[in-house]
Regions:
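C-terminal structural segments of small proteins and small subunits
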Residues: 62-90
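Short S/T/G/P-rich N-terminal loop/turn motif that feeds into the first structured element of a domain
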Residues: 1-54, 59-70, 93-99
Length: 99
């Protein structure tokens, strides 16, 4: 069953975010992930103001997602992330395919 990373973020360092994106994208692909949403326009139908940016990444499973997040490949991106952006990161499991 697919699993998703939902990231609400605000960029603090425009140069650092490009470095982070490059490293993160390579590590995501290596673990079978793919971007579904990457900073497109967002609107709010209910609730508070929208986050500055939203990113959604799909992985084949929650196990694979957790392997990616704990991986040495992504650890390098996390080092850059700490100074490049603030974020809230959510992991969520998808629903089984409809039959």
């Amino acid at each position: 069953m697919s699993a998703y990373v939902i990231s609400e973020l605000e960029v603090r360092d425009p140069i650092g975010i490009e470095t982070y994106r490059s490293i993160a994208a390579a590590s995501i692909a290596q673990y079978g992930g793919r971007y579904l949403v990457r900073g497109g326009a967002a609107g709010i139908a209910e609730g508070g103001p929208p986050p500055k940016n939203i990113v959604v990444v799909e992985f084949p499973s929650m196990e694979r997602l957790c392997e990616w997040y704990a991986s040495p490949e992504y650890a390098e991106a996390l080092t850059v992330r700490r100074s490049a952006l603030d974020r809230r990161l959510i992991f969520v499991e998808g629903v089984p395919p409809q039959r």
